Amino acid sequence: MALVQAHRARRLHAEAPDSGDQPPRRRVRQQPPRAAPAPARARRRRAPAPSPGGSRAPPTSGGPPASPLLDASSKDTPAAHRPPRGTVVAPRGCGLLQVIDAATNQPLEIRYHLDLARALTRLCEVNLQELPPDLSPRELQTMDSSHLRDVVIKLRPPRADIWTLGSRGVVVRSTITPLEQPDGQGQAAEVEDHQPNPPGEGLKFPLCFLVRGRQVNLVQDVQPVHRCQYCARFYKSQHECSARRRDFYFHHINSHSSNWWREIQFFPIGSHPRTERLFVTYDVETYTWMGAFGKQLVPFMLVMKFGGDEPLVTAARDLAVDLGWDRWEQDPLTFYCITPEKMAIGRQFRTFRDHLQMLMARDLWSSFVASNPHLADWALSEHGLSSPEELTYEELKKLPSIKGTPRFLELYIVGHNINGFDEIVLAAQVINNRSEVPGPFRITRNFMPRAGKILFNDVTFALPNPRSKKRTDFLLWEQGGCDDTDFKYQYLKVMVRDTFALTHTSLRKAAQAYALPVEKGCCAYQAVNQFYMLGSYRSEADGFPIQEYWKDREEFVLNRELWKKKGQDKYDIIKETLDYCALDVQVTAELVNKLRDSYASFVRDAVGLTDASFNVFQRPTISSNSHAIFRQIVFRAEQPARSNLGPDLLAPSHELYDYVRASIRGGRCYPTYLGILREPLYVYDICGMYASALTHPMPWGPPLNPYERALAARAWQQALDLQGCKIDYFDARLLPGVFTVDADPPDETQLDPLPPFCSRKGGRLCWTNERLRGEVATSVDLVTLHNRGWRVHLVPDERTTVFPEWRCVAREYVQLNIAAKERADRDKNQTLRSIAKLLSNALYGSFATKLDNKKIVFSDQMDAATLKGITAGQVNIKSSSFLETDNLSAEVMPAFEREYSPQQLALADSDAEESEDERAPTPFYSPPSGTPGHVAYTYKPITFLDAEEGDMCLHTLERVDPLVDNDRYPSHLASFVLAWTRAFVSEWSEFLYEEDRGTPLEDRPLKSVYGDTDSLFVTERGHRLMETRGKKRIKKHGGNLVFDPERPELTWLVECETVCGACGADAYSPESVFLAPKLYALKSLHCPSCGASSKGKLRAKGHAAEGLDYDTMVKCYLADAQGEDRQRFSTSRTSLKRTLASAQPGAHPFTVTQTTLTRTLRPWKDMTLARLDEHRLLPYSESRPNPRNEEICWIEMP
């Protein structure tokens, strides 16, 4: 076919067939016109101008008359005789392929013929040869790659090269030599079988083929080319490389880096406005039972209360009555169960929860069936099922014309501090994978234990949502709202939530923080425990527990007076325990309502999301809620119009996840003075350190491609090489990034006890003044190190990440919380203040969340993808645990004893045909007792369980690939938050130690003795320096807590924590003792202004603080300093060992055992600092190296 101009104006038609031979590369030819026509236009046609008389103009001389575009005669012309119309395009003769040679990694350009038969025929004609007679062009036209070798054998070229195209543009070259065989024999005989010509009649020129899948093409030529390493474009001499193409290749095409950064998924913070909720708030009381696994805690009492939507509350109340629960006399919606029988409480609570979720699931199913009356007929006609409940979910979703309004039901099992105790104690009984719900439900489960607690234990029963569709307008999402179309399923969700995870404090303190009424008094739980263990407890004449069961005398007197006011003659310990437990449940239920209303009001008013139906219990922790609010604020500000946060805020994944995590370094915590300090000591604390750091600029935008990254890294290195010239943290020419660095410290006289960076090279995190090698640091750390006199060198690393710009991405979030906190202080709203404070401190923790490749599933909950991963070797089962079987229904055969005679014992070893004598005695019989010659066997009880192994087996799965897939958390923001805090402390160090530069460390005065993450303990000299050089950073003198982009500078404030309780002035401790990190005591606080004295401060992490005081810690230090090994100091406390899933033989899943931990109190032994003298410590340096460092270097010996 060819594009040919017609012999009349502005018409195109096909070229007439030409039977003559034409050259292989026939170009599109234009026939010479009889008369020069007007230039043709491709997209526009015009009729000739009409003549004045109204008739058409005569045809051009020398050519046929021009016909009109549409006339009556053309309509009557048969289609076969009409002239063809339109554009005719000649097919291409050759194709072009740009590939990579797998053997040499060389980029190539392969030009190949599209028509194999025609190209091979013409090639033979050019070389004056012919194709073999048994190889027809039709056979070549229909040939696929599986017959290529046979064709080559028929052609018998000297050599045939075959380029096979693989994945991602990689080709593999192979060669066939038909005249040679691997066994050394010739091919002549084999060729004769395929080709009648003599052996010498083969092709005399080599061939080259290209195999693409099953298609075979003849290669015209193969030329080496160049390939751009930044954009992957192939070129011969030069090319233009655009930044857009480089970025696209780096983030989406390059197999090595395309999965380094993932878009963060987003869904609005609000829940569906029509969600129906039921809250079951409960609490349990336990006693100690000596079992096979130690002191195991067994529940003997459970109290629960219902709340939420009125129809669901009524249904739950009626169900509790039907199942025989006792109603608490003071509240009609509170029920309880009391029994000391082991496992009885768990079984009864499990039964209630199973029946409740089944009741709600059937309610959802009934509404679905009512909305789809054609369901029953369709199930019968399509699947032959008499009941729709026999359908599976996969079958149900194929139901045509699903109708109805979707419903969303949520059942919350709520308690205070239940995830670490109550839910574990009850879990072996209440976790029931099988429930009598209709078959069409899609059942999924999210079970996640973490750090000895059940973080998630959610079950979802889902049905198809007829209104689900992909969202195109995201205006509602920007306001935090959602509607029917945003949910793929309508569902019932059963979730376990812990109010402790949302308050981070005890129930009594939480009630005070949220302005809830708190009942005075408490219960003597030690007496209750002894009562259930031994059957009695020590009491007074009226049954009231004696003083030893109470915390102290004051608590004993208070509770006795409260009981006396009730006017009861005899103390009923069980009833009193029930009342206290029920009151705790009432307070927890009120706390649930308060949290729901307060957080919803905060999101609506403070955050400004008026369309968001926010439910704080939708997410289990305060950290997850803070991260959801942050994502919503970013989505509202950026308006990405997609289901993620857009390309500007990404999450590091795979190799980059571990690389970024390496730059996350915890805070400092160590003393630089050990022993007793008898001079004034002040404690300064940074105000909202993480909140202030969050307001500072953070990296923003997709990471730069390697070309732009190299330019940015060069700009950084040039700035770092200018020694003596400080770098501004907010220099717009230097882009944010994460680098691999080497750093060398200045002279030791220029160092101080607060190093600017820390290292894990020795196995432990050490704040060190040693040289740094191969450390991963942020660009903020580069400035901090450089400004402190360190020489910093950037190490080339392909994982180095540079971002295109800075952005105060979390500033609005922090400002909202600070404004809410200030408003709460003015209005004296303790609830709002607690919420703002928690959310302000929790966001950084959500950024730093550490992910892994492990998950814990029940055996019968492994989906098809998980099973496929296990069989393919991509997932390993690290361990398996089995639950206790007491919760399962069982039939027990009691112990029994049987006696056998010697003849009967012989029958046991005989063959079957020898035992067919009917006169022989029955093998199992009971002979008279004491019969001689008989042997007695005692059989232990046998338990037959009504359960499958999937109900009891808990698997810990781990992916073989160690790389973490992350699309949730922007972990690099946590790196920069911590880097900004290190910049704060570095500036603080300048206030204290800049005047000492040049003086040897051992000759410097003592200015600070202890440093924590956000605090510093300073002496009188350090206090004076803070009041002079650091005055602008003291909160009482004014200052900002929020970074101002218009006036960029480090923004942080401190305040003196040791203040006088009488006048509010700064106070000091006249004497202190320091034993180890987080193990110190301040004897007292003295105010120099008014002379008042108050109680000191004691910190003893891991120890029972109530058993320690200042004098004990002083005695401990002196005993150790004087070498008194006989005198040992220790503290003891009761600890609960929680086991959820463990491969240890001595730990049983879902058990809580009580143990007593005894810790030795002693000064710091395994120090991460170098000792300067008897008391003073200094960070490691070149003259005082870290003894733990064992760096390995490659040295070649001559």
Swiss-Prot record:
Residues 1-90, 179-198, 906-931 are annotated as: Disordered. GO terms for molecular function: 3'-5' exonuclease activity; DNA binding; DNA-directed DNA polymerase activity; nucleotide binding. It catalyses: DNA(n) + a 2'-deoxyribonucleoside 5'-triphosphate = DNA(n+1) + diphosphate. The keyword Mitochondrion does not apply. GO terms for biological process: DNA-templated DNA replication; viral DNA strand displacement replication. It comes from the Viruses. It is found in: Host nucleus. Pfam families: DNA_pol_B_2 (PF03175). Eukaryotic-type DNA polymerase involved in viral genomic replication. DNA synthesis is protein primed, and acts in a strand displacement replication. Assembles in complex with viral pTP, DBP, host NFIA and host POU2F1/OCT1 on viral origin of replication. The polymerase covalently transfers dCMP onto pTP, thereby initiating complementary strand synthesis. HAMAP family: ADV_DPOL. Heterodimer with the terminal protein; this heterodimer binds to bp 9 to 18 of the genome. Forms a complex with viral pTP, DBP and hosts NFIA and POU2F1/OCT1 for initiation of replication. This is DNA polymerase. It comes from Human adenovirus C serotype 2 (HAdV-2).
